[in-house]
Curated annotation (Swiss-Prot):
Physiological role: Part of the twin-arginine translocation (Tat) system that transports large folded proteins containing a characteristic twin-arginine motif in their signal peptide across membranes. TatA could form the protein-conducting channel of the Tat system.
GO molecular function, one term: protein transmembrane transporter activity
Designated name of the protein: Sec-independent protein translocase protein TatA
Domain of life according to the entry: Bacteria
GO cellular component: TAT protein transport complex
Membrane protein topology class: Single-pass membrane protein
Keyword Oxidoreductase included in the entry's annotation: no
GO biological process, alphabetically ordered: protein transport by the Tat complex
Pfam families membership: TatA_B_E
UniProt KW keywords: Cell inner membrane, Cell membrane, Membrane, Protein transport, Translocation, Transmembrane, Transmembrane helix, Transport
Length: 53
């Protein structure tokens, strides 16, 4: 039950309406930084588990 293209477009439209065109680049930048930090955290957690074994 993944997101189809139409669902993705609706979500993007809602985000655009809520934040407006001026603030949207900042919101996307913050989201990208958050995702990168999450991925880096997941990598760190995986390597810690290997050391404990």
């Amino acid at each position: 039950m993944g997101m189809s293209v139409s669902h993705l477009l609706i979500v993007l439209l809602i985000i655009f309406v809520l934040f407006g065109a001026g603030k949207l680049p900042q919101v996307m930048s913050d989201l990208a930084k958050g995702l990168k930090a999450f991925k880096d955290g997941m990598k760190d957690d995986g390597s810690d588990n290997d050391k404990n074994k």
